[in-house]
């Protein structure tokens, strides 16, 4: 169906060109058919579509494939065939431009409204952020104060602990000194007792030796006396 419409449209274009120009160049027909085939123009408005949207493509094709003498003739024939559609194209373009300007105005209004809304949102967000920042700074100040108080208390506790440790060390040194002194005194007394005991033992031993010597001498004297008496009696 689409191919039939294109063929019928091409026939209509050829007949239009023939009424405009008695004998249109063959290259003109070839270029119109080529451009119409590669474009989106279809239906009964093919010639209008080609004249308004593809006229530059047709002229370029004519300059490329038409002989030198036929190119200008073909371009003139194409322009004369599209003369009625060019005025329609101008009115369509003006309508499109007015519609575009209206759309631009509407877009500008919408953009302005959107910008105003965004500005309000930004201001509200900025206010909230300021409040949040103040609350955060207050909380940070409170936290710093608590931290400072905690550090002070920790420092005081550390000082007290250090003082207690120093006192304990002093007490330990004094106890060690007293224990050393007591041990030294005990050792001295023990040495003195040992010396006295040794002296007493030596004295006792000497006395025993002297007593034993004296007993032996008495026994010897008594024996001599008994012998002397026995000799006298004999």
Curated annotation (Swiss-Prot):
Residues the entry annotates as binding heme: 46
Biased composition (Low complexity): 86-207
Region (Disordered): 86-208
Residue ranges of the propeptide: 216-234
Regulation: induction: Expressed in both yeast and hyphal cells at the same level, indicating that it has no morphological differential expression. Expression is slightly increased by fluconazole.
A Pfam match: CFEM
GO cellular-component term (any): cell surface
Keywords: Cell wall, Disulfide bond, Glycoprotein, GPI-anchor, Heme, Iron, Lipoprotein, Membrane, Metal-binding, Secreted, Signal
Disulfide bond positions: 27-66, 31-61, 41-49, 51-82
The keyword Ion transport appears for this protein: no
InterPro entries hit by this protein: Extracellular_membr_CFEM_dom
Covalent lipid adducts (GPI-anchor amidated glycine), residues: 215
GO molecular function, one term: structural constituent of cell wall
Main location: secreted
Membrane topology: Lipid-anchor; GPI-anchor
GO biological process: fungal-type cell wall organization
Post-translational modification as stated in the protein's UniProt record: The GPI-anchor is attached to the protein in the endoplasmic reticulum and serves to target the protein to the cell surface. There, the glucosamine-inositol phospholipid moiety is cleaved off and the GPI-modified mannoprotein is covalently attached via its lipidless GPI glycan remnant to the 1,6-beta-glucan of the outer cell wall layer.
Signal peptide interval: 1-22
Disrupted-gene phenotype: Leads to increased sensitivity to caspofungin, Congo red, calcofluor white, and zymolyase.
Subcellular location: Secreted, Cell wall; Membrane
The family this protein is said to belong to: Belongs to the CCW14 family.
Role of this protein: Beta-glucan associated cell wall protein involved in cell wall structure. May serve as cross-linking or coat-forming wall protein.
Protein name, UniProt field: Covalently-linked cell wall protein 14
Species: Candida albicans (strain SC5314 / ATCC MYA-2876) (Yeast)
Source taxonomy: Eukaryota, Fungi, Dikarya, Ascomycota, Saccharomycotina
């Amino acid at each position: 169906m689409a191919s039939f419409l294109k063929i019928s449209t091409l026939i209509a274009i050829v007949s239009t060109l023939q009424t405009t120009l008695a004998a249109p160049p063959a290259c003109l027909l070839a270029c119109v058919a080529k451009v119409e085939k590669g474009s989106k123009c279809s239906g009964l408005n093919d010639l209008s579509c080609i004249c308004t949207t593809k006229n530059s493509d047709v002229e370029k094709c004519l300059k490329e494939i038409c002989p030198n003498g036929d190119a200008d003739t073909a371009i003139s024939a194409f322009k004369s065939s599209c003369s009625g559609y060019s005025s329609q194209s101008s009115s369509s373009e003006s309508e499109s431009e007015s519609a575009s300007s209206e759309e631009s105005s509407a877009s500008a209004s919408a953009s302005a409204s959107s910008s105003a809304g965004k500005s309000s949102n930004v201001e509200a967000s900025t206010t909230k952020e300021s409040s949040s920042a103040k609350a955060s700074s207050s909380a940070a100040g409170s936290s710093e104060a608590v931290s400072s108080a905690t550090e002070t208390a920790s420092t005081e506790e550390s000082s007290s602990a250090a003082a207690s440790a120093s006192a304990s060390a002093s007490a330990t040194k004094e106890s060690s000194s007293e224990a050393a002194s007591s041990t030294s005194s005990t050792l001295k007394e023990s040495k003195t007792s040992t010396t006295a005991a040794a002296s007493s033992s030596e004295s006792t031993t000497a006395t025993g030796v002297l007593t034993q010597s004296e007993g032996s001498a008495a026994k010897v004297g008594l024996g001599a006396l008994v012998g002397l008496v026995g000799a006298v009696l004999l």
